[in-house]
Every structure is written in C-alpha cells, then in structure tokens.
C-alpha cells in the first residue's frame, strides 16, 4: 500500500464535505479516499489517454454536475500526471465566488470532457439517475444501464467481464446507506457484491473507492462497511 496522502491519526475528527481530501491510499489498480473528488486524479494516473474504457458508477449520488470553466483544467489533457496537491488546489473565480475546480460531485463530467474515450459505455447503479441530466451535461454520457440493488450484487462481474473494453469502477460506500446514514443492506449482501466484483478484477483497469463519511452516518459506519469490501477484494491490512 502506498499512502499518497497518509491517513491522519485523528481522522475521526476530520470533515470531508464538498472539497476536503483527508487521505488517499493506493494499492495495485485500487485507490481509496474519503472524498470522491480525488477519483478523477486516480484515473489520470492509471489510464491510457488513447485507450477506450467502460465506466461503472456505483453510488447513491450521480456525481454528474459540471460547469467549471474548461480552461481552468484543460491543461490536464496534456499533463495528466500532476501531483494530487496540484489537482486538489485548482481553483476558479466567477461572479465574486471562488471555488475549487474539482469537488465531490463534478469530477466525472470534467474528466469526461478531457477524455471522452474513457466513458465509451457507462453503467450506473445509482437510485438518483435514470439518464444523464440535460442541465448537467458538458457532453452526454452513454448510459447503457442503471442497475437496481437486486441485480447489482449478483451481476456486477457479468457486466464487467462481458464488455470488450476494460472498466473504470467507481464505488462510493454511501451506496449501501440511505440519506439519513442508515445501512440498507446486510453484511452478506455487501460481501457478496465485493466478492463478485473481485472475480472480475482482470477486466478492471482501476477501482476507485470513496468512503464519504458524512453520507454514511459517520466515519465508524463508513470504515466498517469499507472493511467488509476491502477484505473481499484483498486489500485489508
């Protein structure tokens, strides 16, 4: 394991929120973070700019907001291997408002604008998206399927294995919780999902996992569910 941003000893007292990144850990082809905003940076490190990939977004939220001016991050297309500090430090200013270029819900659309070939086919498992919302689009996503929970755990490996191109799998732990932080699924469901996902590892180019503690009822709940998944995919310490 490579700690790109080491986990603070007082992590339970930290806030992730919209644009705080408290830790980022790297295993072979797997990245673990507290804030999903860093997923885009991980893809920039791992993926071939010229190659085509499929995309699987497993999340309680669609994360499809766009809108940051392209010129603020366009340079990443020719220089994808910037440091995580450069990536998270990118800012823009508009109408007297100053904000971060990459936040927890806009990274997908912005990376897609840089490398549309990384999103040749998109699978979602997200209760809040049916199709790419027109008011969010920078360019449309080719969403071929939005899987329900009864399909996901037992079929995720089938979908990943049966596409021609390898997958970006983008998992948020909050998928397993409701909007009040209540766990929706049993440990057996979560472990079965993770085991099936792991069985398709040879067809996964990169797996990004976000804990999103504020959406999971707190750090303890997020870490516990992450621990179930980590053990099944072989990255538990």
Protein language model regions, located:
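Catalytic cores of soluble, metal-dependent hydrolases
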Residues: 1-54, 68, 81-237
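Short, solvent-exposed beta-strand-terminating loops
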Residues: 52, 56-78
């Amino acid at each position: 394991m490579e700690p790109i941003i080491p986990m603070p000893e007082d992590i339970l007292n930290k806030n992730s929120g919209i644009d705080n990144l408290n830790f980022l850990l790297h295993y072979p082809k797997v990245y673990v973070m507290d804030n999903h905003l860093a997923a885009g940076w991980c893809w920039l490190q791992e993926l071939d700019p010229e190659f085509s990939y499929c995309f699987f977004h497993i999340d309680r939220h669609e994360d499809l907001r766009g809108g940051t001016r392209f010129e603020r991050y366009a340079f990443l297309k020719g220089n994808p291997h910037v440091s995580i500090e450069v990536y998270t430090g990118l800012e823009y200013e508009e109408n007297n408002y100053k904000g971060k270029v990459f936040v927890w819900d806009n990274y997908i659309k912005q990376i897609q604008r840089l490398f549309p070939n990384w999103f040749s086919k998109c699978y979602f498992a997200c209760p809040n998206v049916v199709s790419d919302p027109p008011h969010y689009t920078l360019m449309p996503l080719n969403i071929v399927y939005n899987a329900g929970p009864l399909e996901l755990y037992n079929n995720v490996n089938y979908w990943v294995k049966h596409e021609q191109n390898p997958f970006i799998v983008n998992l948020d732990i909050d998928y397993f919780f409701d909007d009040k932080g209540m766990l929706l699924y049993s440990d057996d469901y979560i472990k079965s999902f993770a085991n099936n996902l792991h069985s398709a590892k040879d067809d996964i180019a990169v797996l990004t996992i976000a804990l999103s503690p504020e959406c999971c009822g707190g750090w303890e709940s997020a870490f516990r569910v992450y621990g179930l998944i980590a053990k099944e995919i072989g990255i538990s310490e």
